[in-house]
UniProtKB/Swiss-Prot annotation:
Midbrain. Belongs to the GnRH family. This is Progonadoliberin-2. It is found in: Secreted. The modification Glycine amide is found at residue 36. GO terms for molecular function: gonadotropin hormone-releasing hormone activity; gonadotropin-releasing hormone receptor binding. Keywords: Amidation, Cleavage on pair of basic residues, Hormone, Secreted, Signal. One of its GO terms (cellular component) is extracellular space. It comes from Suncus murinus (Asian house shrew). It comes from the Eukaryota.
């Protein structure tokens, strides 16, 4: 008897999980006629065009020739990022964090 009741509960749970309430008005960002987000068909926003790469860029990457593909990039794209934070500011931030840690360890927690 107990297994029949458990089976019925399991069947009802399965039916609840598989039942769909009906079509939804909003679309998921990855589906539908308007890829890119939930928006109405008369939305004034046009999707941005994809960036254009120089001719032969992908061929250079596919052939394993990094020189050919890097020659078409601006020199600033290949340079390492500049560190704009001064050493003094880094030191001050480090001391501030150390002070906070010390206070947290010394003060009793409620």
């Amino acid at each position: 008897m107990a297994s029949i009741g458990q089976g019925l509960v399991l069947l009802l749970l399965l039916l609840l999980l598989t039942a769909q309430p009906g079509p939804l008005k909003a679309q998921h960002w990855s589906h539908g006629w308007y890829p890119g987000g939930k928006r109405s068909p008369d939305s004034p926003q046009d999707p941005q065009p994809a960036p254009r790469f120089p001719e032969g860029y992908w061929l250079g990457l596919a052939a394993g020739n990094p020189r050919q593909s890097t020659q078409s990039l601006p020199s600033k794209a290949l340079a390492p990022p500049e560190d704009t934070v001064s050493e003094e500011a880094k030191t001050m931030a480090w001391w501030h964090l150390q002070k906070q840690r010390l206070i947290q360890t010394l003060l009793p927690r409620p």
